[in-house]
Amino acid sequence: MEINKIYCMDCLEGMKQLKDKTVDVVVTSPPYNIGIKYNKYSDNLSREDYLNWIEEVVKEIKRVLKDDGSFFINVGYTAKDPWIAFDVANVIRKHFKLQNTIHWVKSIAIQKEDVGNYPNIIGDIAVGHYKPINSDRFLSIMHEYIFHFTKNGNVKLDKLAIGVPYQDKSNIKRFNRKGDLRDRGNTWFIPYETIQSKEKERPHPATFPPKLPEMCIKLHGVKKTNLVLDPFMGIGSTAIACIRLGIDYIGFEIDEYYCRVAEERIKKELLKTDGKFDNVKNKNIITLDAFI
């Protein structure tokens, strides 16, 4: 199969056509099986059928992933079904080691008194987007999980590639650091971009922002990443992240409409470069191969 394409087909059939140990990083987000309304996919399988299906996908991912590769999987949950993310992780643990658990924070509120005495923070902070829960029992859900799996649990990461500056600059000298960056940790605040029309700008009901796969790839290490796979490409966020980083990608998406949206998003992303995107390895990028 050719790289830098999104194949509009079932990911199990697609991955079977990939060679063993050819992928450096997998970043994906499968259907959560929590009743989300997709165009073509039923998100209401029995728990047993859903987890069996997830395991078949995971087996193929393990086959195509290099021994020193990283597998990042984003899984959400609902207040009524809080265990689904852990059930998915428990299936994957049969085949991979859980190296890191990352919390994708979509919205956060911090009172000034809890921040400390920093001159650049002058008031309370409340930023991000979330879907409020109308309930007197459940809290609104502000985060999802990103499970980082590897084959052996010992893949070295480029933590400072997604590092953050020290608030207290005296820590740079105190900890004998070479620069003003520290480990971000496992809480990643990645808000959605503000949009005017969800139907036009974010038609997929459960997509992540391109910054999420971009950070996953950077954490694994851009220099050692040649090919990224997303088995559930959706509207192309992982492909966009790869284009921005100059890394080859391949993906699968069963829904024809989402494939076409992905194609348009990728075209717009390439136009933003104004012909100066010299780090794209394959300039002849074709996003769709065929509708099956």
Swiss-Prot record:
Gene3D superfamilies: Vaccinia Virus protein VP39 (3.40.50.150). This is Type II methyltransferase M.MjaV. GO terms for molecular function: DNA binding; methyltransferase activity; N-methyltransferase activity; site-specific DNA-methyltransferase (cytosine-N4-specific) activity. It comes from Methanocaldococcus jannaschii (strain ATCC 43067 / DSM 2661 / JAL-1 / JCM 10045 / NBRC 100440) (Methanococcus jannaschii). Belongs to the N(4)/N(6)-methyltransferase family. N(4) subfamily. One of its GO terms (cellular component) is cytoplasm. It holds the Pfam family N6_N4_Mtase. It catalyses: a 2'-deoxycytidine in DNA + S-adenosyl-L-methionine = an N(4)-methyl-2'-deoxycytidine in DNA + S-adenosyl-L-homocysteine + H(+). Its EC number is 2.1.1.113. One of its GO terms (biological process) is DNA restriction-modification system. Keywords: DNA-binding, Methyltransferase, Restriction system, S-adenosyl-L-methionine, Transferase. Coiled coil: none annotated. PROSITE patterns: N4_MTASE.
